[in-house]
Amino acid sequence: EMTSSLVGSEMCIRDRPYNVNYEGSTEEELTIQNDSMENDLFATFLRQVFSVMFAVLKPGGSYYIFHADSEGENFRASLRKAGFKIAQCCIWVKNTMVMGRQDYQWQHEPCLYGWKPGAGHQWNSDRKQTTVWNFDKPQRNAIHPTMKPIALMAYPISNSSTLGQIVLDIFSGSGSTLMACQQIDRICYAMEIDPKYVTATIHRYRAMFPEQPVRLVRNGELLDVEQTADMIADQNKVIQ
């Protein structure tokens, strides 16, 4: 329902859920909602998500979809059914592996790249960029089990949008897309279903950008700074 206000976004970057039932390795053992579904249910979920993305993106708007390689078939099929063009698959190469239960430990994540047909897509970089992205992963994911480095999110955003344009992230998690947009002067529309990650994102944003005011809207009313601070504090107590 909330996505109707997001129509006109110039770009979408999406991370999670991957449907791999991931659990963080920190003492908090953080998890992700909707990250363990039966195959048919997950395929339906993806089609619904990508249909919403298609509806709100402008023609020519680019997307970047991080995903698990084991679910690549579902992601590609769902993107095509929604109407998107799949142009390339980029690879985020991490500086260290992620310990798991498979024979070969994962040290990369694929990221599908393409755009909504109907207009020319933006490309703001040179012709020397490659499909291999080398960015160190965070040393500790205390905020979110799969927190992305801000520099990683800023890289494709810079390539496929311009100053002041709207970047949509409908699974914002730890808020790395929001932080990246703030650093490179884009407008970020972010959505997150889990209250603890919403609160964590707000705290992270306030710590990184203390000069920026943060205000919340509740029941259609824009709260002042003090009311916002009180609500954040109350929500933090509930989560703890």
Which sequence ranges carry the predicted segments?
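Conserved S-adenosyl-L-methionine
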Residues: 152-221
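Conserved Class I SAM-dependent methyltransferase catalytic core
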Residues: 39-95
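Mobile active-site "lid"/loop adjacent to the S-adenosyl-L-methionine
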Residues: 17-45
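Single conserved hydrophobic/aromatic residue that forms the stacking wall/gate
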Residues: 1-8, 13
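Flexible, glycine-/basic-rich loop-and-beta segments that form/coincide
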Residues: 97-146, 150
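Conserved phosphate-coordination/catalytic loops
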Residues: 36-47, 143-151
